[in-house]
Design a protein with these regions (language model features):
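N-terminal small-domain helix-loop-helix segment of the aminotransferase-like
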Residues: 1-30, 37, 87
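Conserved PLP-anchoring active-site segment centered on the Schiff-base-forming lysine
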Residues: 24, 41-63
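Conserved coil-to-alpha-helix start sites within the AMP-binding
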Residues: 31-36, 55-59
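A short helix-loop-beta submotif of the ANL/AMP-binding
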Residues: 64-71
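Helix C-cap/helix->beta junction micro-motif
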Residues: 66, 126-127, 156
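Active-site phosphate-binding strand-loop segment of PLP-dependent enzymes
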Residues: 71, 75-146
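Active-site PLP attachment segment
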Residues: 152-172
Length: 172
């Protein structure tokens, strides 16, 4: 299949309530490359990226490579590993360029309720930074596929990362 055919099939597969067209799909050699491309496009030296703890180490590695700062927000095990939105709000600064959200989360297994997802999207929209939605495990949640965060606000600045290898249990 051609790249255009692949993009069309990915757009159909990932839509789930988000109007998807091939011009909204970027093919990369893996999610890691997509994350690196997005961060390099969005972040300048000295900027800040809000990153959950625990996190996927690539986010902090790429942020450091850009000479930007990873600002960690907590996910609370006492609250099902959900992010503390008030704490995230307190960590934001004029240099904040992105908010990383890993949902479903690895390694915690947390799947965020729509109310939390909406609050996170609202933060990004209101304060002018991009929400990086790491949704690579979206097809592997115990309760069935997790709808993309972007469906909650089609105008919000959301970049969603998916992974066919994770969806088909063939990572590596």
């Amino acid at each position: 299949a051609s790249a255009d055919e692949a993009k069309a099939r990915i757009a159909d597969f990932t839509a789930r309530g988000v109007p998807m067209t091939t011009d909204r799909v970027v093919l990369t050699s893996g999610t890691s490359e997509g994350i690196e491309i997005a961060l390099n496009a969005l972040v300048e030296p000295g900027d800040e990226v809000l990153v959950p703890m625990p996190t996927y180490p690539l986010y902090t590695a790429v942020t450091a490579k850009i000479a930007a700062k990873a600002v960690y927000y907590r996910t609370d095990p006492a609250c099902g590993w959900l992010p503390d939105v008030d704490q995230i709000r307190s960590l934001m600064s004029p240099r904040t360029r992105a908010l990383v959200v890993i949902d479903p989360n690895n390694p915690t297994g947390a799947v965020y309720p729509d109310a939390v997802r909406r609050e996170l999207i609202e933060l990004a929209s209101r304060h002018g930074f991009v929400l990086l939605a790491d949704e690579v495990y979206g097809d592997l949640a115990y309760d069935g596929p997790t709808p993309p965060m972007a469906r909650l606000d089609l105008d919000a600045p959301v970049i969603s990362f998916g992974s066919l290898s994770k969806a088909y249990l063939a990572p590596g």
